Amino acid sequence: MKMRSFQTRAFDIKDQNKVMRVVVAALQDLGFIIERANGPMGLVTAGKFGPNGNGFVEVTVVVRAKGKEQTEVRVNALFNTKPVEDPKAYQNFFIAVERSLFVTQG
């Protein structure tokens, strides 16, 4: 449960498609290559090589409506098939998402 708390964030935006576009842009800004993006399912998968080319980082992001006024984003990250448990990795992702949302709203 603790890990889920830093993997999930709700945004006060009801436009799920907009949040999907922002998630894709944020991942690309962080150096990820988008492998799959399925808008109707709210699913994005991406990957990139780890620091100094060591290992591989895979992320799966799920975007879904939360009530009538919010959209929830949940990200799961794996490094060489092991779950990433460092909250900072998830914080960096959500900072990039928030930055992109701010730019698109401004």
Model-found features: residue ranges?
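Ser/Thr-rich, low-complexity intrinsically disordered terminal regions
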Residues: 1-106
